From Swiss-Prot:
<feature type="topological domain" description="Extracellular">
    <location>
        <begin position="159"/>
        <end position="167"/>
    </location>
</feature>
<comment type="subunit">
    <text>Homodimer and heterodimers.</text>
</comment>
<keyword id="KW-0472">Membrane</keyword>
<keyword id="KW-1133">Transmembrane helix</keyword>
<feature type="transmembrane region" description="Helical">
    <location>
        <begin position="67"/>
        <end position="87"/>
    </location>
</feature>
<keyword id="KW-1003">Cell membrane</keyword>
<comment type="similarity">
    <text>Belongs to the Casparian strip membrane proteins (CASP) family.</text>
</comment>
<dbReference type="GO" id="GO:0005886">
    <property type="term" value="C:plasma membrane"/>
</dbReference>
<dbReference type="InterPro" id="IPR008253">
    <property type="entry name" value="Marvel"/>
</dbReference>
<protein>
    <recommendedName>
        <fullName>CASP-like protein 0U1</fullName>
    </recommendedName>
</protein>
<feature type="topological domain" description="Cytoplasmic">
    <location>
        <begin position="112"/>
        <end position="137"/>
    </location>
</feature>
<feature type="topological domain" description="Cytoplasmic">
    <location>
        <begin position="1"/>
        <end position="66"/>
    </location>
</feature>
<keyword id="KW-0812">Transmembrane</keyword>
<feature type="topological domain" description="Cytoplasmic">
    <location>
        <begin position="189"/>
        <end position="205"/>
    </location>
</feature>
<feature type="topological domain" description="Extracellular">
    <location>
        <begin position="88"/>
        <end position="90"/>
    </location>
</feature>
<feature type="transmembrane region" description="Helical">
    <location>
        <begin position="91"/>
        <end position="111"/>
    </location>
</feature>
<feature type="transmembrane region" description="Helical">
    <location>
        <begin position="168"/>
        <end position="188"/>
    </location>
</feature>
Amino acid sequence: MSGGDIDPTAINSPKFRLIAVQCLFALTAFATMAGQNKNLAGPDAMTLEECGPYGCGYHKFAVFQFLVVICVTYWLFTMLWMGMYLIQKVPPAGTEFMIYAVFNVLILIAFSTSWTECNETIVDPTYPVCKRATGAKASIAFAMFTWLALCVSMMFTWKEWRDQNYEGLPIFGDFSSFMPGGGGGGMGGGGGYERPSDVNTQTYA
């Protein structure tokens, strides 16, 4: 790839910067959980006894493993997405919104189930699973921050898609006439899938 293929102005886009923030949040979320190799009081009394006096690691908990997998996957996605912004190869706004929506649901499930597990009590009613597990608690917090930032990205992308009359979702074509505020040509109405050249730097009030 030559230097001329890269658009340096992409980093000025609020959407690009939001993705960069999410990249750091997701990296921190999975790294702190992956480093939690002891001090978890669970997932059950038998397993805790096997782990010994220092407690269990995150790998003994299915929900914590799920959190790590989702955050690693989203971190890799954000790295790829930032690269696509820089080379101006981002998919249509409709496609981008749907991808964000899928990750939004997965991250919400990951951090909410992990938070619930973290507050479970196995041995003592006053001693939750994550009482001494600062890494796990930090991981869940950063997963939540990732989700909140992703919600903002979805809002920006939704507004962008709305401004394009909901065109550009490859699976359905142009279905703007079925969406609020749309006035396009229906399911096969000839809407294009190319995004305007100024989308990467567009801001919204």
